Structures are given as C-alpha cells and as structure tokens.
C-alpha cells in the first residue's frame, strides 16, 4: 500500500470517529439544559443501537451490490451531517421538542452506522497486507475520537450546542472527502444474495457452539454498563469539576495502549484469558 493511499485511509478513519466522539458522550450535558427528561435520554441512546440493527440490511442489499463504496459513504455522511445540523437547529428553537430532536438523531444514526462497515470495507479492499496494515490505519479512528473530546474541552463546548454543529459539519466534510477516496467497487456486485443471507439467518447455526454462545452472551452483558457509561459518565465527571470531554477521552488513550500490547496478550494469555481480564 503506497504512502498516498495510507494517508487518505488514515484521514478517513480519523474523521469517521471524530464525528461520533464530538457529541456522543457529552450530549447529556447540553440536552439536560433544554428540558430532556430521563426517558428522553433513554431514547437518545436507544436510536443508535436500533439504527445499528437496521443498517446491515441496507449494507447487504444496496451498498455491497449496486454502488461503489466511496460513493455510498459520501452520500450517507452528507445526509447524516444534514440530520445532525437540523437537530442542532431544533435545539435552539423557542420550544425545543425532545421527540423531534431524537428523530433527527435517529436519522443521523441510520446514515452513520452503515459507514462504520463501509470504511472498514474500503480500507481492507485497498490494502496489500490487511493483517499488518489495518490496525495502523484503524488507530487513527481512536485518535480522531480523542481529539474531538480535546477540542470540545479546549473550546468550552462540553455543554454547548456547538458540539452538535461540530459533529454535523465534520460529517458534511467527510461526505465530500469520501468522493476522493480510492475507488472501491461493490464487493457483492453480480452475486445472487438471498433474503436469508441478508437477514443473517445462516449465522444462527453458530449458536449451537457453546464457545460462540458464551462469547455472544458476554458481549451482550458487557454492553449494558457501556450504555450507562455513555448516558451518565459525563454528568458525573462534570460534578467532579473536571473537563468532561477531555477527561473521558483518556478511555480511548488507554485503548491505543491496549491495541499495541494486544498481540503480546494473545501470545502469552490466549483468547479466553485475555477476554476474562478485559471483562
């Protein structure tokens, strides 16, 4: 993989996660100011997982079969950025509606979550040695999330509507940038795809394997405290008189460290013990 492609893919990953990190963990600090209730926050952080359930159908039926990956990526980010900017606009109205704002978040997430898979597809397609090159490219996504948090705290936007504008304009910029990424034809072009494959029903047979079942149950359980973290940690950090976005970004700093040492853990501990220590 040449230097030019490496830089372009690194920038892609950086902005991809900058968008998400710019608002997702600090949103409650502003939304509480405009009247969001506990139930409203519940929906704010439920629309993302719902969109994540829906998005594979879009990727399987359209993005993987009909259009070049970089073009789909560009269109989705432009639409998602527009939805986030509309949400920011609604927040500043005379009587902001939590329902309307959450619907805008849902529209944004419906566009954003497919791009997580699409950026991976695009990156892997344009690598000559994915096993070695992908981790080095993917780490720029984590750096993007970290820098988004630092920008928020540096500018004093931890509890400002400007965090949503930052995310929206970053998504629009990513949308434009995507059209200049390396051409990546749809991986499923010309292939017959059944509804069973799109729905992932063929994968259900894996649940017959005890090891896979345990892994899925563990993944399910570990996502429960993660959901509470996203919804509540920022307010706890703020009450401790710390900079919320900056302070919470250190979680991603530790992620970079563990991404570096993970190969050592694989060799010394094996998968089972590594997962046990992590959980």
Indicate residue ranges for each PLM-predicted region.
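Residue-level signature of mid-helix packing/kink "hotspots" within the transmembrane helices
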Residues: 49-57, 145-146, 252-260
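Helix-to-loop junctions at the C-terminal end of transmembrane segments
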Residues: 54-68, 156, 258-271
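Juxtamembrane intracellular "pre-TM" segments in multi-pass secondary transporters
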Residues: 1-3, 181-217
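Hydrophobic core of transmembrane alpha-helices in multi-pass small-molecule transporters
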Residues: 14, 83, 96-118, 122, ...
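Symmetry-related core transmembrane helices of the 12-TM Major Facilitator Superfamily/SLC fold
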Residues: 148, 163-180
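Helix-loop boundary and gating motifs at the non-cytosolic
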Residues: 2-49, 211-249
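Glycine-rich segments within core transmembrane alpha-helices of 12-TM secondary carriers
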Residues: 52, 131-152
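Structural signature of the two symmetry-related core transmembrane helices
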Residues: 71-86, 273-279
């Amino acid at each position: 993989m040449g230097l030019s492609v490496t830089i372009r893919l690194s920038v892609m990953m950086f902005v991809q996660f900058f968008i998400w990190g710019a608002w997702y963990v600090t949103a409650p600090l502003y939304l509480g100011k405009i009247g969001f209730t506990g139930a409203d926050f519940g929906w704010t952080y439920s629309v993302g997982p719902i969109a994540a359930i829906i998005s594979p159908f879009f990727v399987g039926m359209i993005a993987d079969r009909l259009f070049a990956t970089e073009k789909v990526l560009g269109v989705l980010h432009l639409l998602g950025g527009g939805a986030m900017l509309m949400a920011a606009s609604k927040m500043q109205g005379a009587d902001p509606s939590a329902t309307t704002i959450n619907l805008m978040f849902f529209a944004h997430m419906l566009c954003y979550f497919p791009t997580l898979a699409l950026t991976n597809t695009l990156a892997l397609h344009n690598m000559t040695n994915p096993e070695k090159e992908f981790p080095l490219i993917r780490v720029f996504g984590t750096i993007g999330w970290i820098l988004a948090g630092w920008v928020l705290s540096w500018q004093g936007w931890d509890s400002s509507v400007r965090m949503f504008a930052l995310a929206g304009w970053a998504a629009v910029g990513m949308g434009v940038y995507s059209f200049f990424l390396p051409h990546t034809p749809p991986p499923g072009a010309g292939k017959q795809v059944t509804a069973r494959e799109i729905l992932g029903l063929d994968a259900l047979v894996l649940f017959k394997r005890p090891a896979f079942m345990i892994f899925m149950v563990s993944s399910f359980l570990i996502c429960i405290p993660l959901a509470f973290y996203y919804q509540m940690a920022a307010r706890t950090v703020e009450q401790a008189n710390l900079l919320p976005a900056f302070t919470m970004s250190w979680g991603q700093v530790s992620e970079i460290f563990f991404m570096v040492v993970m190969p050592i853990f694989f060799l010394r501990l094996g998968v089972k013990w590594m997962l046990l220590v992590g959980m």
